[in-house]
Amino acid sequence: MSFRGTVKWFSKDKGYGFITREDTNADVFVHFTDIQMEGFKTLQKGQKVEFDVVEDTKGPRAKNVRVLGE
C-alpha cells in the first residue's frame, strides 16, 4: 500500500531523514537507499513524495520513495 507525505527534513550528509505522512501526520524514517531516483539520492524539505511503509526494528520505515511532480 502506498502513502503520500511531505519531507520533514533530510540530511544529505548523513543520508537519512523523515517524511510526515498525509493521512496520520506521523513521521516515517527514510534512508537514501530507499529513494527511487537516478544519480545522487537526496530529498529536499517540503517535497511531496509517495512511498511504501515497512516495519523496521526501530519502527516504521519508508521504502520505494518517489518524488511527486518532478
UniProtKB/Swiss-Prot annotation:
Region forming the signal peptide: none
UniProt-annotated location(s): Cytoplasm
A GO CC annotation given for this chain: cytoplasm
MF (Gene Ontology): DNA binding; nucleic acid binding
Mitochondrion in keyword set: no
Keyword DNA damage recorded: no
Entry keywords, A to Z: Activator, Cytoplasm, DNA-binding, Transcription, Transcription regulation
UniProt domain CSD: residue ranges: 5-65
GO biological process, one term: regulation of gene expression
InterPro entries linked to this entry: Cold_shock_CspA, Cold_shock_domain, CSD, CSD_CS, CSP_DNA-bd, NA-bd_OB-fold
SMART domains on file: CSP
UniProt name for this protein: Cold shock-like protein
Organism, as annotated: Aquifex aeolicus (strain VF5)
Gene: csp
